Amino acid sequence: MAIRKEIGIIIQSKDIGESDRLISLAGETQVRMNFISKGIRKSKRRAIISTELGCLVEVDYYDQVEKDWKSTKEIHLIKRYDELKKDYVGTLFVLYLTELTSQLYPDGENHPFLYQLLSGSLEVSNENGFRKEILPFFKLRALTHMGHFPTEFYCHTCGEEVLTKAKAYFSVDSREFLCSDCHPITKDHLPVLKLFHTMLSKKFSNVLVIFPKEAEYREGDMILNQFLRSLLGRELKSYFEFYKTIGDL
């Protein structure tokens, strides 16, 4: 039986029976798959930490085409992001980001961009500490890549770019941009929409320089959270504790 390798971030980890654990990766090259590590929870040789959420791992697995999951030969821990996980907020951030990625990443599909986005977000947060500003950046990049959020900022009514208008609004319900020339705008989203537009074309560090005000990121994150509720039909399990802890609930 052929042995294959995959590198990725663990976005789902759950116990099976008394000693097994099932994990799922946002992988570097392969489609999203489930891997079972038999007996790892009782093993004295294999480290259970290698199946922890948010860890960067390399999995050696048996390529069993007929099964819904792959049996692992070995799981090698590459990086745990210890600096990020050493405090409560950082740990909650990892749990939130991995759950969000898991919800957006369908089984059997191949999205290496999500792996790059997730690993990059964890890496920069591990090096520089968690910043709230990364939340809307991650969500917007992930949602646009998966085709859920529009990437062109044109008014649904007149077809002109809303970024050039006096005011603009994003309707979560209809997932459309509206401009002040065509509609009365009771809540102006224009500063946030300009932030979104920049996020889609610049690195996170550059976005922070161009848009230094935290309030714009907070409002952008609120809009994207509303969008996620509409898209998923529910709140993420990790949402309440995470947002309560960072003071944005």
From Swiss-Prot:
Keywords: DNA damage, DNA recombination, DNA repair. GO terms for biological process: DNA recombination; double-strand break repair. Pfam families: RecO_C, RecO_N. One of its GO terms (cellular component) is bacterial nucleoid. It comes from the Bacteria. Involved in DNA repair and RecF pathway recombination. Belongs to the RecO family. This is DNA repair protein RecO. It comes from Leptospira biflexa serovar Patoc (strain Patoc 1 / ATCC 23582 / Paris).
